[in-house]
Amino acid sequence: MRAFARQMTERAKAVAAAGAVAAFWLAVWMLVAALVAQPLILPGPGAVALALLRLICDAGTWAILAGSGARILGGLALAAVCGGVLAGFSSRSRAFAHLVAPALSFVKATPVACVVVLLLIWLGSARVSIAAVFLMALPGVYFSLAEGLTQADQPLEQMFRLHGVRGWRLFCAHTWREVLPFVLSCARAVIGMSWKAGVAAELIGMAVGTVGERIYQAKLLIETADLLAWTVLVVAASWACERVLVWLLRVSGPVAWGAAVRAHGHGLRGRARAAGDGAAAELALAVGDCAPWAPALDGLVLNVPAGGRICVMGASGAGKSTLLALAAGECAPCSMVFQDARLVESASALDNVLVCADARVDASSAAALLRLLVPGVDVHARVAELSGGQRRRVEIARALLCPGGAVILDEPFTGLDAAARDVTADAVLDLFDGRMLLLATHDVADAQVLDISDIITL
């Protein structure tokens, strides 16, 4: 109750502060208008308010505003689609990025008036606003998305791909979540700019039935109050459009993640073996040929029979993680616990497990496994709130419920005490279900609790 009261008090203070600022600038406006004493040059707030009221009460105003808004949003949507496609290609091809970037930088630096005049020559006044908005918004969308894709968490994407999360599910679970902060930043800058570019294009092109045409008419007739009233309407429409679109973008993140979680296991049947359907085929890997950068692995050939258990031991830097990564690439999609933590920090422990789980795994069984491995855990708590040992066991639960013919564990018991390690090892033995099991560790006790006797020492 106190927190609610405090929140309401803070909101009231914010509203009061905003009102005080607005009152100050209205007073400044009234003072300057009184000093100028020329309504044709600078009408006062009262005259502009009357003109604005007259426009609001005219149904034609809303039709004109809606038409201009639709064209502006159409150009913005086209820029978003094309910018996304170009950014996607650029993230996969450095040559393509070098080819596209100069052209978009040139467009970004070109004055709006020059662009509009050229578009009028090429397209005519009817379509000039859509094209102008498209060209003005495209560079901002492209560079923001390209930056977001460049800075995306590559190890986390590797984890998703290895666990069979691909296609639209990978986009919803990872790609969109990674680029969304960049998209939000871009939206705040581009939406307002798009309205300015669109109205400017209508004004220069004198497109019939548009906001730009009405502003031009007000200028010809020296109806300054009407001109300012239309300006207020455009600013309000731009502000409302930005607020709505930014809100929709914010909501899209959790919605996309939820869709990926609900569709767990989608598309994996026929590509990956679910637990209980039989072990993966044997693995024969000439490790030295695959990793020439790792001298410690030179000449090593890894042979693992179907359903076999292998432990790889060695000092830090001996190449254990490299060996397991190569094996995972051969077995993908498979289940893997990486040496470094790879979790979606903003999501719950349960969702982190379910997003990679087999389609036959429901939320109740995933939650039961989490509670077994992490006694007392709130499965709906964000993993960022969990301790290191708890987070480790969330990753182990994810690996055990993920479909695939192999379970690969890289230092899985790091941060666990002996009791937690024993409980976790029992769960691994119960649920790996005859699949190939590869373990990397520096502690022989880890191999013992998992009943692994075949040990490779690097």
Regions found by a protein language model. Give the residues of each.
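Transmembrane alpha-helices
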Residues: 131-135, 168-201, 234
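Q-loop/switch helix immediately C-terminal to the Walker
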Residues: 340, 346-359
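Conserved ABC ATPase "signature" region
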Residues: 363-378
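Walker B catalytic motif
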Residues: 382, 411-412
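Conserved ABC ATPase signature
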Residues: 382-386, 390
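Hydrophobic anchor residue at the start of the ABC signature
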Residues: 396
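ABC-family nucleotide-binding domains
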Residues: 410, 417
